[in-house]
Amino acid sequence: MTSFTESKKLDEIESPVPEIIVPSTTNGNGTIESYKEKSVGTSFLDFFRSYKLRPDNEFAEVHNSEDFLKPRHLQMIAIGSCIGTGLFVSTGKSLKNAGPGSLMINFIILSAMILALILSLGEMCCFLPNQSSITMYTGRLLNNNIGFAQSWLYFWIWLTVLPSEISAACEVVDFWTTQHLNPAIWVTIFLAYVVLVNAFGARSYGECEFVSSFLKVVIVIIFFFVAIIINCGAAPKGGYIGAHYWHHPGSFRNGFKGFCSVFISSAYSLSGTENIGTAAGNTSNPQRAIPSAVKKVFYRMGFFYIITIFLITLVVPYDNPDLGNVSPFIIAIKNGGIHVLPHITNAVILVSVLSVGNAAVFAASRNAMALVKQGWAPRFLGRVDQKGRPVISYLCSLAMACIAYVNAAPDGSVVFDWLMSVSGGGAFVIWGLSFIDHIRLRYAMKAQKIPDTVLPYKFPGSVYLSYYGVLINFLALCALVYISIFPVTHEKPSAYGFFVSFLGPSVFIAYLLISPIFVKPTFQSLKDVDLTTGRYDLVNSQMYVAESSTSELSEKDLTKPNLQSNDNKNSEDLESNTPPQKKSALQKVADFLC
């Protein structure tokens, strides 16, 4: 899974220290005073007072985690946020079920689809900026009922990420345990860690993500060279391997069924990447941000996924008995006879798994606020504290994480498969509808005779890329249906086997069926689609008119005496003559990779 903070511009200046907003009070005259602000101090009581909920009728915009992060946080998170459980853990099971050939083909197809998705979303988000969630476009451009079902599915996807990551963390810890310990112990420890990180706000989250992203990038780069050394036969153990494992035991396993089985784990690995397009489309310069975002995704998919997975297939055969239980990274290093590095790698994997869980808490709360704004969720989910943090949705995310305690049961390991099915299978529904939204936008513009020249960002042939995306997601859903009915394990068809593979789309269908109870069905033609509210060019023209009127007023004030002090003038001169700061080494690395 991918973090929301990854697509913030890397050259952004450091934000000020967060402020605590004190609720408005009534003074002696009976009038209501405005909110007063005071700096967050070191007072222990102020920390707890900041969590006091605002009145029920007061809702505020959720403070993005980027608002209080330093540039070094944003730079490192942007590089390493795409690396997580999908790459470190899930690829082992996919390699075991499908073989190296199916694994590579599947990831290449989905990576190309993700690039098309970033372009389509970027085009939509530039034209109709949206600060909440990508699912808001479906209700506006397509249908309210479908938008309702998609939004709730997306909320559940992020809500299930935290317990799935904690379940995966329990499996990672098993690498060290020589004696069987109750998994509930580890679940409690990991859950307490997530609570502490989120309790201290965005700064603590940023520090933890900075460290974890740095470690993830370092371990992937180390594995890149170690895998080449092992493959060439220069490791302490083993000889030259080359492409031997692609021939013996082979490139494909379980045929077409094996290929179809990889879709869930691949989607689970890549889900969340779509938020890069949303964030880039909401920047002040989308014409520059969107190409940068596409280049960023291209490099990540190419290096951190395609090349890394290819190296895994070269040094780990699909018939290795440890696959599915141990990370393929660790299996490869152990097979090479390297003794210390497996423990270091496993520790980094544990940190990366928990970091994805931290990011999921932020993402789930953001989608909860989007549901409340649309009137599709209970208002209590939108309650915020004095600093604008969605405390209730945070608590819902943490409460959902308690599902991970099921790992203490004898068959508790299947919980991770169920939770991954919601994220993996549901991602195809989210992506497919996003492509349909983009196609709908283009046809609505034609029906309303809006030229495409008004688009702040336009990619040639983007509509055809959206058709490609719809086709890939439709075929992926068909593959999930096929593998749900006819499992890759050659078992007889069962309800359990069906829902463990098709749970995400099933959640969408369930919400779609009950949507008429909560949402009035709307069937709008292309000419009736709202393409004016919040539109980029219209908002900018209104701002231009406002600025013009302001400038006319300021011209009248030119005849008035200038009351500005010389000290202020001197300070402004100093600021204007200040040379630009040189980029740090970390900024240069980020610019190269991103």
From Swiss-Prot:
GO MF, one annotated term: amino acid transmembrane transporter activity
PROSITE patterns in alphabetical order: AMINO_ACID_PERMEASE_1
Domain of life: Eukaryota
Keyword RNA-binding assigned: no
InterPro entries referenced in this protein's UniProt entry, alphabetically: AA-permease/SLC12A_dom (IPR004841), Amino_acid_permease_CS (IPR004840), APC_YAT (IPR050524)
Keyword Transport attached: yes
UniProt GO BP: amino acid transmembrane transport
Chief localisation class: membrane
Ranges for region Disordered: 550-587
GO CC terms: fungal-type vacuole; membrane; plasma membrane
Alphabetical UniProt keywords: Amino-acid transport, Membrane, Transmembrane, Transmembrane helix, Transport
Membrane topology: Multi-pass membrane protein
Location in the cell: Membrane
Annotated TM spans: 75-95, 101-121, 146-166, 181-201, 210-230, 297-317, 323-343, 344-364, 390-410, 416-436, 468-488, 498-518
PANTHER family from the UniProt entry: AMINO ACID PERMEASE, AMINO-ACID PERMEASE 1
Family: Belongs to the amino acid-polyamine-organocation (APC) superfamily.
Protein name in UniProt: Amino-acid permease 1
